[in-house]
């Protein structure tokens, strides 16, 4: 019961507040920009099934990485990747120490962006 409350609270925070400096409204603007229907990211089903919502956020971040970050310099790329990696893992983390520790390890052991969305989705699937 307690974990359900934390999960739904996480969804509300993602939808209404800034997540690691990336406003949720910017994520949804990007959904329109890349012609991904808003309903694919959040709808009645994803609100009642938090795992699907988290996976949709990871897919969106992967799409943004593929199309946007290709035009950035290497230093800009690394800074933005790290921010969005944190955002994605916050979307998947419900505050337990294991997830937070994994996010910190990712900070230190950065791996290529193009593969990140796929790995993040696999990590979420594995945890559940």
From Swiss-Prot:
List of residues that carry Phenylalanine amide: 116
InterPro entries, A to Z: GAST, Gastrin/CCK, Gastrin/cholecystokinin_CS
A biological process from GO: neuropeptide signaling pathway
Name of this protein: Cionin
Keyword Secreted: yes
Modified residues (Sulfotyrosine): 110-111
Organ and tissue specificity: Expressed in both the gut and the neural ganglion.
Subcellular location: Secreted
Disulfide bonds: none
GO molecular function, a single term: hormone activity
Cellular component annotations (GO), alphabetically ordered: extracellular region
UniProt entry keywords in alphabetical sequence: Amidation, Cleavage on pair of basic residues, Hormone, Neuropeptide, Secreted, Signal, Sulfation
Annotated Pfam families: Gastrin
Annotated propeptide span(s): 23-108, 120-128
Similarity comment text for this entry: Belongs to the gastrin/cholecystokinin family.
Source species, domain of life: Eukaryota
Signal peptide (residue range): 1-22
């Amino acid at each position: 019961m307690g974990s359900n409350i934390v999960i739904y609270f996480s969804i509300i925070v993602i939808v209404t507040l800034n997540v690691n400096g990336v406003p949720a409204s910017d994520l949804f603007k990007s959904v329109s920009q890349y012609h991904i229907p808003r309903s694919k990211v959040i709808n009645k089903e994803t609100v009642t099934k938090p795992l699907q919502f988290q996976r949709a956020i990871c897919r969106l971040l992967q799409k943004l990485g593929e199309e946007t970050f290709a035009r950035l310099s290497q230093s800009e790329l690394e800074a933005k990747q790290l921010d969005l990696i944190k955002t994605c893992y916050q979307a998947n983390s419900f505050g337990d120490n294991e997830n937070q520790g994994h996010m910190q390890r990712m900070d230190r052991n950065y791996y290529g962006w193009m593969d990140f969305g796929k790995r993040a989705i696999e990590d979420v699937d594995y945890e559940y």
